Amino acid sequence: MLDDDKGTAMHPHITPFTPEYSNELLRRVQDLYHEDIKHYYPQLKLEKLLDLLEHTEYLFELYLDSIHHDRPNDALTAFIIGCYYVFLIIPQSLQFQTRNKSYSIYTDLKKMYENEMNMTNVVLMVKKEIGVVLDESVKHGAGIEHRITKKRAFSVPADDLSGQVASLSLDTAAPQDHGLKGTFTEDDAEQSSPVWTAPNLEPNDQLKLALLPEVIPTPAFREPERKTSVPVRPSVLLEDVPSIYHEDDTSFASLNPPFREITADRSVTHRKDSYHSVYMVDSGNLKEDNDDLFNVENDGFIQSLDILQKQSIITAPELFSILSNRVEREKVLLIDLRIPQRSAINHIVAPNLVNVDPNLLWDKQTNTPIYKDDILEHLLKENENFINRNKFDYIVYYTDVKTFMTINFDYAFIFFYLMLTSQKTPLTTVPTTLLGGYEKWKKTLHSYAQEYHISIEDYLYRPYSQKARLQQEQQQQQQQPDSQDSFSAKESSTKVPEPPSWKPPDLPIRLRKRPPPPPPVSMPTTPEIPPPLPPKIMVHSQVSSISRKPPIPAKQHVKKEQLNSNEIIQRKRQHQHQHYDQQILQPQRAYNIPTIERSPNVYVSLSITGLRNLGNTCYINSMIQCLFAAKTFRTLFISSKYKSYLQPIRSNGSHYSPKLSNSLSMLFNKMYLNGGCSVVPTGFLKVINQLRPDLKIPDDQQDTQEFLMILLDRLHDELSDQQHVANDYPNLLLYNADALKVSNNEYKHWFDKNVIGNGISPIDDIFQGQMENSLQCKRCGYTTFNYSTFYVLSLAIPRRSMKLSKLGRSTEKRVKLEDCINMFTSDEVLSGENAWDCPRCGPTASVSTSVSALENEPSIVKSKKKKSRFFTLHTGTKRRHLDFFGDGITEGHNSNNNNTTIFERERSRSPFRMLGGSGKRSSSSTPFSTGGNDSNNSSDYKNKKLTTVKTINFVTLPKILVIHLSRFYYDLTKKNNTVVTYPLILNIILKNNDTMKYKLFGVVNHTGTLISGHYTSLVNKDLEHNVNIGRSKWYYFDDEVVKADRKHGSDKNLKISSSDVYVLFYERVYD
């Protein structure tokens, strides 16, 4: 599309103007629609999406050029018309609902128009007028005379299907008979399907570790005097309430039950507030040369520390109960584990505060974490509080999201390890981490300030807040002598103020409801050879280098020179597998896929893994969970098979950087191997943020289906080495026009130019389907065909009708997913000015026009009314286009044969070489035309009414069918909360009458608005996505929170209704 620097904000020599929000502007917007847009709107909706996108870009360029040449009137006209294209014409166009790479261009164009800050008033005015237009269109049937409904999608009643579900397979040939007899259910049955609601969440639903007491005992946690051990339980979040403190209490520990018995209500906590999960270290950060730091006898001890760290937490209300007490706060050593720049501008106020830079925990020379506490003590030797840390009753450390996103290793665990294993300064208490970190502390203080009227500045140091600046100015006025010169005054005002003295006000007893818990039962000692623990199942062979923790030095008395690194690695692998060799390991699969399905822990065997929400990343987490459940897609990246399809280095030296595919593979491997844990997708998010900084990860909420399109588009570009893809997926290059019931010549022309010409990839084999759009003139029988591909099928939700209940009350009927598909594929009869301007018999056609001449007719809008340069589709203009992922800019040129812009770059290099439409419209006399007239019989049809039938058919459907329900209106501020009933088994009929049968395995739900809403997902984690009762395994994923959901359908309940369902994932199955 456009270059990155286009836009008035990036052109210092362009002086933008800002139209006022006025009645005059409103009249200008309305006049342009009624005098110009309205006349062309019906015809423009029938144009190819790619042509509309190119013309919208042209209008934006015309707007910039008019501003540059000081023509504000022309600039305003071009911008208003461009807005109508972006927010009205394109979303209502014929090909918009089939989402392919062209959709990514549309989203970027939309952002360019919205990012013109000086034209914000114009955008608001246009959106308001579009709302009026669409409301009128709904009242008058959108110009559609009537619909011819075709039952292209259906599901069968439960009684007919329950006996067939078990026979479904993923391996046999597709059935040919769709058998419509008895397949449509009654409305009463649809209304009786259960309405799904999110399950109630409990404390243990937040994943910590995949450890079951009966499977993995923990001898390292036994107290010396005890004869029996208490199994380690996953730690839980504590109640988000302040703690009680009574002045006559002498001990906190005497009032507390054991820490492991404290429970909490997860529903009152927030998914974003927890840092308490598994931190993964990218294997790329650890050199294989440092593998000799591992010791096979130390694995059990490291896992013990890992468990203890996850249990050693303190909530923000509990820390507040300590810091608000004049006696207990002196017993706390608070460690700010953040980069110094962050600590300098804000931190928790405490009498004994130490800032430890996480970068100090990494040895840059050896590229490993430091493993001796005396190294850290030497670096912090001037800090008396840290040196005397063993004299404190409480040691609490905290971090924040920005530091976590900056540091690439698990600094929290390294710090915990150094503190707990220190021989020089043994601690009397276990260090605890502040649950939720700085962000949770800040949120808690704001809550208390509103409820209890505490002063935030007494507990939070923020020198640049408004209140702090006022206090600073008052202190300077009181302390500054009159004789001080102005230079000194200016210098002192620029310094960062010192933290306030510790004098918090006394708080009412009602604010302190519970004292903090004592440390966990006991602290493991550091033996020479610690007791062994059964390890988590590790990756076989090549993938075994992925480690959950940085290397920790060995303490076994073995000389390093006696063993080389290969021997140590071999011993380590033998030790890791000795407990599971006969139970778990199977013959090695192709591409070294690790095998864990036989684990007795269901969370491990099914790889049920939570994902950390680092701010507003729930839209990414929910989509990743569904993609991870798509077996074909998951295997491609877990097996590393994807590497054989990466783009080779180019002759000119430039090449694709396969960052996204590599980071997705690493993320999938972590999720696969760490069932029962919550994984932090830091590396993956960093790559996405690098490729698409406009998404503003992790701060802004985005549309999850737009993220899916970005992900699939990029993966397609990276995995498009044509030679290897063609060898492994020859089906992508082959087709049988007769079997597909398509016109051989027209389809072949489109297929060669757009499918093969644009490049193929494994993503196409999994997600790509094909559509046929046709326009048939009922007056002369002339028909034009247009083909396109899609990754996501975006469906509008039909308007709900009212029905009377048995009690005589009117209720809104639910909408079936099959109805959404059938409305999408139904034939539309267009008449009057909404009819297609047939090039043979339409208003602009010449009676003497021959059929041969018509076949070369360019696809542009024509009308009796004279058009200005704003409305002619500029698809042949030579110009530059934006490479969305930094691959460079290319020039387009015209083909000699048609009016469509052709690009010489490879498929993955050009955003305009999309799966949009054919290079030219194919035309023929339709075989089912009733008239069958040609130009020689023009007198026979000249007196007939001009009527057009618009038809959409599925030519092919993908292995994984992704359906997006379009719940948000054009301006994304309103949401359609209609209850949609969706089936577990879905049948869709192709154009050739073959029936494709699909099985539901994933759902993305959305609650709230697009800006302030929340995404969750439902996934059938059964390895074969079985829907039989007792075998289906539906799990509800809310970031790190995971819960089994037994209400989400089975072979006895094949339909589910929900007002939150947003994206559905279906997998093709065969009888």
Swiss-Prot record:
Residues 609-1069 form the USP domain. GO terms for cellular component: cytoplasm; cytosol; nucleus. Residues 467-532, 913-942 are annotated as: Disordered. The active site is at 618 (nucleophile), 1014 (proton acceptor). The keyword Protease applies. The keyword Transport does not apply. InterPro entries: Papain-like_cys_pep_sf, Peptidase_C19_UCH, Rhodanese-like_dom_sf, Ub_carboxyl-term_hydrolase, USP_CS, USP_dom. It is found in: Cytoplasm. It holds the Pfam family UCH. Belongs to the peptidase C19 family. Residues 481-495, 920-932 have a biased composition (Polar residues). Keywords: Cytoplasm, Hydrolase, Protease, Thiol protease, Ubl conjugation pathway. It catalyses: Thiol-dependent hydrolysis of ester, thioester, amide, peptide and isopeptide bonds formed by the C-terminal Gly of ubiquitin (a 76-residue protein attached to proteins as an intracellular targeting signal). Its EC number is 3.4.19.12. Involved in the sorting of ubiquitinated cargo proteins at the multivesicular body (MVB). Present with 606 molecules/cell in log phase SD medium. GO terms for molecular function: cysteine-type deubiquitinase activity. This is Ubiquitin carboxyl-terminal hydrolase 7. Residues 471-480 have a biased composition (Low complexity).
